[in-house]
């Protein structure tokens, strides 16, 4: 089940070791409203069908073609792809480490979870929003938003990704170690 946990970022607190959430909700309408108030897009799409183990990128993109085209058109995104992470992925440790560092992008980060789950952590002013996205969830993080992503130590997800550039995922790391003070997906 999708979940939103809102924490103070701890920058004004003497005790930064174990933040206490200001809000925790698993109600989709409340998640959407809280994120929208902060400029973050969140939608839930019906999960069309189970993803076969052998499903490749073209199969995934075809299964969600109408929804993908709508997001691509509405957001002006140039390209779309699908990424699948498994517990035995050879680069899982390096990728998790990279994604866990706070960063920004020059473009929106838009993800739709076809299967599995991931934790988007958004550092917005004096708040940190931990957004657990699961199968059927779409999140749109605007360009320039400080955030990090946790796919877990044993990642198991497939996500559709939209981009404004042909290069794909390009991050600017902030150097802030804030992500170390907040819960992870595991």
UniProtKB/Swiss-Prot annotation:
Enzyme Commission designation: 1.13.11.54, 1.13.11.53
Pathway in which the depicted protein is active: Amino-acid biosynthesis; L-methionine biosynthesis via salvage pathway; L-methionine from S-methyl-5-thio-alpha-D-ribose 1-phosphate: step 5/6
Molecular-function annotations in GO: acireductone dioxygenase (Ni2+-requiring) activity; acireductone dioxygenase [iron(II)-requiring] activity; iron ion binding; nickel cation binding
An individual GO BP term: L-methionine salvage from S-adenosylmethionine
InterPro entries xrefs: ARD (IPR004313), ARD_bac (IPR023956), RmlC-like_jellyroll (IPR014710), RmlC_Cupin_sf (IPR011051)
Site (May play a role in metal incorporation in vivo): 102
Cofactor: Fe(2+); Ni(2+)
Positions bound to Fe(2+): 103, 105, 109, 147
Ranges of biased composition (kind: Polar residues): 10-20
Job of this protein: Catalyzes 2 different reactions between oxygen and the acireductone 1,2-dihydroxy-3-keto-5-methylthiopentene (DHK-MTPene) depending upon the metal bound in the active site. Fe-containing acireductone dioxygenase (Fe-ARD) produces formate and 2-keto-4-methylthiobutyrate (KMTB), the alpha-ketoacid precursor of methionine in the methionine recycle pathway. Ni-containing acireductone dioxygenase (Ni-ARD) produces methylthiopropionate, carbon monoxide and formate, and does not lie on the methionine recycle pathway.
HAMAP family: Salvage_MtnD
Protein name as catalogued: Acireductone dioxygenase
